[in-house]
Swiss-Prot record:
PANTHER family named in the record: FIBRILLARIN (PTHR10335:SF17), RRNA 2-O-METHYLTRANSFERASE FIBRILLARIN (PTHR10335)
Entry EC no(s): 2.1.1.-
One GO BP annotation of this record: tRNA processing
Family as reported in the entry's similarity comment: Belongs to the methyltransferase superfamily. Fibrillarin family.
Functional description taken from the UniProt entry: Involved in pre-rRNA and tRNA processing. Utilizes the methyl donor S-adenosyl-L-methionine to catalyze the site-specific 2'-hydroxyl methylation of ribose moieties in rRNA and tRNA. Site specificity is provided by a guide RNA that base pairs with the substrate. Methylation occurs at a characteristic distance from the sequence involved in base pairing with the guide RNA.
The protein's name: Fibrillarin-like rRNA/tRNA 2'-O-methyltransferase
Organism annotation: Halobacterium salinarum (strain ATCC 700922 / JCM 11081 / NRC-1) (Halobacterium halobium)
Keyword Signal part of the UniProt annotation: no
SMART domains linked to this entry: Fibrillarin
Length: 210
């Protein structure tokens, strides 16, 4: 699995082979020679890279990021991607996200609900190269399906599915099977991996539109 152009493994102190992107610091992360440490324990996409999944991201991609929160992960994405549309529903995290975007001209924060793509369809370009999804809400598969309209025919969905957001009492493996079955209504699932030890009860998914 190759990393996208603009993502490298660098040395930070005594640690070698640490994921990093080149850009302005966003959340107090260590920076060495202009390279920002990308902590997989704080980032589902970072963990997906560490798990070795082929995301299809190559660098310079147009990205729709669903569930941007305060910008921790999407700040790294905007360091190596092209235009990056960052959708977040909660006003408080968006305040931080706006600050992150100040130093990233390719990052476009959107205070919108990922469950209602019609509210930002006039802003997001059609045919994006990738949808990166980290939406901790019930109906995660439905979010991916409803946003499929933005994805290029040869694009990729890179999602982190959280079992507890769907059902806090059910066995996570059963929840993931249900979610994958629903995703297959509009996607071909290419790869999956449980995200332990980085994130408990999460599943990384890479899929292409059907």
């Amino acid at each position: 699995m190759s990393l996208p152009a603009g993502v490298q493994r660098r040395s930070f102190g005594d640690e070698d082979g640490v994921l990093a992107t080149r850009g302005e610091p966003a959340y107090g992360e260590p920076v060495v020679d202009g390279w920002r440490r990308w902590d997989a324990h704080r980032s589902k996409l970072g963990a997906t890279f560490e798990l070795g999944l082929d995301t299809g991201l190559s660098g310079g991609d147009a990205v729709l990021y669903l569930g941007a929160a305060n910008g921790t992960t999407v700040s790294h994405v905007a360091d190596f991607a092209g235009p990056t549309y960052a959708v977040e529903f909660a006003p408080r995290p968006v305040t931080d996200l706006l600050a992150v975007a100040d130093s990233r001209e390719r990052l476009f924060p959107l205070l919108k609900d990922a469950r209602a793509p019609e509210t930002y369809a006039h802003v997001v370009e059609s045919g994006v190269d990738a949808i990166v999804q980290d939406v901790a809400t019930r109906g995660q598969a439905d979010v991916a399906l409803s946003n499929r309209q933005f994805l290029a025919d040869d694009g990729r969905l890179v999602a982190a599915l959280k079992a507890r957001s769907e059902d806090v009492t059910a066995d996570p493996a059963a929840v993931f099977e249900d979610l994958l079955g629903r995703l297959r209504d509009g996607y071909e699932v290419r790869a999956t991996a449980r995200m332990e030890p980085f994130h408990e009860d999460h599943l990384a998914v890479v899929a292409t539109p059907r």
